[in-house]
């Protein structure tokens, strides 16, 4: 009893000391500020943080720093909003065999695997993420534990289980099938009542149009956005017809481009200003970097992906990816790189607002390194302007989730979600692979 009381007192003192440190104002001084709005960076910036929020922004010599503030030098650094990853799967850690994973580890999702994924994301500079497919109970619990400060991780916007025509055998906990429009509405209502932040729709080309429409209409009635797969042409056609808010991926086929009717339908949708932007999360890094990965599999040995992962799971993952170039999951990937580039360009031309997302957690895509690689691929393999790329990982995701009042840019009054990295990320975007400073809600984690 005495030992338990002692541990309780130590825990209480630890929490108290953290609160005391966080109670002091913080000043980030000297860095080059990229605020998320797309304007010219602010040199010699000063950012004042009080508690969880940003209270003032200025430059060295133009504003007074409170005498009791903790001063953190950001000289020589790029300072920018905490990154968003708009497509993660915290229930996955990069193992190559889904069937084995789904049979072996569900009992450890909520207690070990999802918290480890969340911590890895945060250490990579990801302070907000959309978790698009995981068991409902664990999704809510892990999100809420992060929000309460019990475990480290990004602010999570969770979908819980996929909504689809029929779950694959053994995946019923995180894939919910629907039978008819009434059942579709009931499933969405169940998710909404449980507290999800977003609805994930997949394989909608295998559902009736009434079912697809019921999912979207019910979700919107609960003020929840709907994201949907865009792997196959009919998924896009039905999603557009039903009013889906955001599409994921650019397709799994080797077709060289989108069919003409889909390009026209996308352009017609983006022209409807009253509906707001049509968002798209292409998740293309894995296609464009696959050849590099096979030539240099040493990158799979980065210990960052082992953070908080139990040793037996680390060993299992390593065993599953030991022959990286032989995984059936990726054999057609080299043939998709050209179509990915074409479709990305067509989406740009059609006026969609694209978001940074990675599908992290799928085979060989680790939460610790997927996000910066996606930004790097946009800039260095697709020629996207670095500032636009950064906005796709900061400002626009917050707009899509309708939380831009509090997130997405470094602005007075917003939550202090801030990262910093040595060097000029507008010239060398890959510097983001080594984030030096991570602040989330005013608390420094790195």
Feature-to-residue mapping (PLM):
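Divalent metal-dependent hydrolysis catalytic cores, especially in the metallo-beta-lactamase
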Residues: 114-137, 154-161, 194-204, 225, ...
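Bacterial N-terminal signal peptides
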Residues: 6-17
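Boundary at the C-terminal end of the N-terminal hydrophobic targeting segment
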Residues: 21-23
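Histidine-rich, glycine-flanked metal-binding segment
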Residues: 33, 37-80
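Metal-associated gating/positioning segment near the N- to mid-region
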Residues: 77-145, 169, 210, 231-249
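Active-site core of metal-dependent hydrolases
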Residues: 201-336, 362, 382-383, 401, ...
